[in-house]
UniProtKB/Swiss-Prot annotation:
GO MF term list: rRNA binding; structural constituent of ribosome
Protein name in the entry: Large ribosomal subunit protein bL20
UniProt keywords, alphabetically: Ribonucleoprotein, Ribosomal protein, RNA-binding, rRNA-binding
Job of this protein: Binds directly to 23S ribosomal RNA and is necessary for the in vitro assembly process of the 50S ribosomal subunit. It is not involved in the protein synthesizing functions of that subunit.
Annotated source species: Maridesulfovibrio salexigens (strain ATCC 14822 / DSM 2638 / NCIMB 8403 / VKM B-1763) (Desulfovibrio salexigens)
InterPro entries from the UniProt entry: Ribosomal_bL20, RIBOSOMAL_L20_CS, Ribosomal_protein_bL20_C
Gene3D superfamilies, per database record: 6.10.160.10, Ribosomal protein L20 (1.10.1900.20)
Length: 117
């Protein structure tokens, strides 16, 4: 019996063209280029999700460092002091405290200062 595969191909083409909506030029209209663009964009999205984690950590460290220096302490001394004091606040929480609750962050810095000196 003869198998006709037009339906499957049409479905696959539609899937890629739907994902390529908004791409420029033939990247959104021609199947072959749309597939290439979509596959590349999915790879870039994967890489971007990894990079975002690095970038956020860098941002948190910059914010903590700036706030720590306002309180007369460097970032590295602050982190060392907190680890020796047994404080288990992560960088995300410390950065949030530094931005949104300066008095609480100052208290944390005092705890670290007591351990370092």
């Amino acid at each position: 019996m003869r198998v006709k595969r037009g339906v499957a191909a049409k479905r696959r083409h539609k899937k890629y063209l739907k994902m390529a909506k908004g791409f420029r030029g033939s990247g959104s209209t021609l199947y072959r280029t749309a597939r290439e663009r979509v596959e590349r964009s999915l790879c870039m999205a994967y890489v971007g999700r990894k990079l975002r984690k690095r970038d956020m950590r860098k941002l948190w460290i910059q914010r903590i460092n700036a706030a720590a220096r306002l309180n007369g302490m460097s970032y590295s001394r602050l982190i060392h002091g907190l680890s020796t004091a047994g404080v288990t606040l992560n960088r995300k929480v410390l950065a949030d405290l530094a931005v949104n609750d300066a008095p609480a962050f100052a208290k944390v810095v005092e705890i670290a200062k007591a351990q370092v000196s």
